[in-house]
Amino acid sequence: MKTFLILALRAIVATTATIAVRVPVPQLQPQNPSQQQPQKQVPLVQQQQFPGQQQPFPPQQPYPQQQPFPSQQPYMQLQPFPQPQLPYPQPQLPYPQPQPFRPQQSYPQPQPQYSQPQQPISQQQQQQQQQQQQQQQILQQILQQQLIPCRDVVLQQHSIAHGSSQVLQQSTYQLVQQFCCQQLWQIPEQSRCQAIHNVVHAIILHQQQQQQQQQQQQQQQPLSQVCFQQSQQQYPSGQGSFQPSQQNPQAQGSVQPQQLPQFEEIRNLALETLPAMCNVYIPPYCTIAPVGIFGTN
């Protein structure tokens, strides 16, 4: 096909060349007959050059020589790549081998060592509890005498609020206030709330006994003497001041749930009077009624 196309192109070029030569010849003869010869020679040379230039078309034959493209077959020789893939699974084998590392067995061994010092810790806790109990007993003995002036102060304020006769005279009342404040300052902050509850509890017991005395038509005594006598009766041996529900058998079951409004009234009065009078901090949880104060009778 290529040879046929080349021959056809040559025929077309030859015909066009002959036509181009024939057309200008009759036009040039009438104008300048002397110049016709060089003009004829120029196109003749050009005509001779056309076939010469057309002849190099056959070098297109080397294109079929490009058939060596099948030389791409050597790419298939690159298949040895799967060969290096074989060693990759080989190093995976040593990874499961380091599993024999079992140092974890040594960890349970030191654990019994930690359990051993836990035993003296329990003994320390017992000692601390014993020390706390001893401190509470000491505080109870101290509170026996410290709560008496504070109780008298609250009784004085309670009697004034209800319009009854005063418990103490004004001169003695000022001294009682000073004693009460000095004693509250010595009480630890953690024990002040319970001390105030004991004061309220003692006041309620005092009121109950006073009502019983009135019912039995006993001789009435001044309230000041009754307070001091009852203070000696309630705290003769240091019992009943700090934990009346446990150490004072007379106080157990004495305050009934029906007396809760009265207890709250006196407690609020004590919380308003004592901290402001003595400039003492009372914890806010002191507004909660202590457990074991109210009996079931």
Swiss-Prot record:
Residues 29-127, 234-257 are annotated as: Disordered. Residues 56-67, 81-101 have a biased composition (Pro residues). SMART domains: AAI. Disulfide bonds: none annotated. The keyword Repeat applies. Gliadin is the major seed storage protein in wheat. This is Alpha/beta-gliadin A-IV. It comes from Triticum aestivum (Wheat).
